[in-house]
Curated annotation (Swiss-Prot):
GO molecular function, one term: 3-isopropylmalate dehydrogenase activity
EC class: oxidoreductase
Gene designation per UniProt: leu1
Localization (cell): Cytoplasm
Catalytic activity, EC: 1.1.1.85
Name of the protein this chain belongs to: 3-isopropylmalate dehydrogenase
Primary localization: cytoplasm
Residues annotated as binding substrate: 96, 106, 135, 224
InterPro entries to which the protein is assigned, alphabetical: IsoCit/isopropylmalate_DH_CS (IPR019818), IsoPropMal-DH-like_dom (IPR024084), Isopropylmalate_DH (IPR004429)
Annotated Mg(2+) binding sites: 224, 249, 253
Organism: Schizosaccharomyces pombe (strain 972 / ATCC 24843) (Fission yeast)
Record bears the keyword RNA-binding: no
């Protein structure tokens, strides 16, 4: 049996705490599913790597990540690393570039329906919200040619996209929609009424779906009206939300507040679909929140986003969807209110008193029952 190698990058401040929680959960999966052998290898990134090696990401760590079947990251950054030429965040940017991950997946849903009351939006507006933002990660205006203001009072950014860049992420979004049960609609967010690149996106995506995925529903939505829908009637975006780098950056952050706490949400960055690509597929997962130095070491951080990131690692990095679903079900049971048969455990970000260890222990216990 060939073990699946997972590189573990705890990172800074709360990073080691939340990664430890996710590892406990993954080790239950390995124990209960002996056919899924996991091998963990820990490395440093961010401030921890700066302190140890003088750089936020070593070549050795990059090599390990490229050879791995998946990478589990905690969080990077903190106020103590002030050298602008050697910032912890530079390590993460370099890692993403080295791994060649071009698609970022950010689910927006409620890990338990009992969490609806914690949303800043009214329950009747957010109940049933369930979509995944698929953001193109390596193209667009963040990577185009630019002209800085040199005192002339003029600056410029360009917004380039190629047919290949748009096509590959359109097919990944279609795959996500196809593998949903039932198949999910895909909504393309763009600004095709103004931007040439958006018209390329709309034309390319429409052609691919018509020729290769005629059974899937494709909708077009202008990004400005989508931002409005996200707070007015977010369920209209349910399914897969496909968009470019800049629009995805903004809309995924807007969506992240819907579930009520950043501590609940996972993300995955991919270089393709396992089993669908001739080349090795890289998978980097991490919670969407930062390193939270103010609560580090207190044992009160919410580990759910990182535990669910481990679920995404199983689903998209190791092609183990059943085990991923088991983790999600265990988390749901822990967060479900006692009135519907759950444990009703919440950390302080959700107004509860449960510690990081309490949540982790409960998820482990529920997962052992499910598996």
């Amino acid at each position: 049996m060939c073990a699946k190698k997972i590189v573990v990058l705890p990172g800074d401040h709360i990073g080691p705490e939340i990664v430890a929680s996710a590892l406990e959960v993954l080790k239950v999966v390995e124990k209960k599913r002996p056919e899924l052998k996991l091998e963990f290898e820990e490395h440093k990134i961010g401030g921890a790597s700066i302190d140890a090696y003088g750089t936020p990401l070593t070549d050795e760590t990059v090599k390990a990540c490229l050879e791995a079947d998946g990478v589990l990251l905690g969080a990077v950054g903190g106020p103590e690393w002030t050298n602008p030429n050697c910032r912890p965040e530079q390590g993460l940017l370099k890692l993403r570039k080295s791994m060649g991950v071009w698609a970022n997946l950010r689910p927006c849903n409620f890990a338990s329906k009992s969490l609806v009351k914690y949303s800043p939006l009214k329950p009747e507006i957010v109940e049933g919200v369930d979509f995944c933002v698929v953001r193109e990660l390596t193209g667009g205006c963040y990577f185009g040619e630019r002209t800085e203001d040199n005192g002339s009072g003029y600056a410029m950014d360009t917004w380039p996209y190629s047919l290949e860049e748009v096509s590959r992420i359109a097919r990944l979004a279609a795959w996500l929609a196809e593998t949903s049960n039932p198949p999910a609609p895909v909504t393309l967010l763009d600004k095709a009424n103004v931007l040439a690149t958006s018209r390329l996106w709309r034309k390319t995506v429409a052609k691919i779906f018509k020729e290769e995925y005629p059974h899937l529903t494709l909708k077009n939505q202008l990004i400005d009206s989508a931002a409005m829908l996200l707070v007015k009637s977010p369920r209209t975006l349910n399914g897969v939300v496909l968009t470019d780098n800049l629009f995805g950056d903004i809309i995924s952050d807007e969506a992240s507040v819907i579930p009520g706490s950043l501590g609940l949400l996972p993300s995955a960055s991919l270089s393709g679909v396992v089993g669908k690509s001739e080349e090795k597929v890289h998978c980097l997962v991490e919670p969407i929140h930062g390193s939270a130095p103010d609560i580090a070491g207190k044992g009160i951080v919410n580990p759910v986003g990182t535990i669910l990131s481990a679920s995404l690692l199983l689903r998209y990095g190791l092609n183990a969807p059943k085990e991923a679903e088991a983790i999600e079900a265990a988390v749901r049971k822990v967060l479900d209110d006692t009135s519907i048969g759950g444990r009703g455990l919440y950390t302080r970000d959700l107004g509860g008193e449960a510690s990081t260890a309490d949540i982790t222990k409960a998820v482990v216990e529920e997962l052992e029952k499910i598996l």
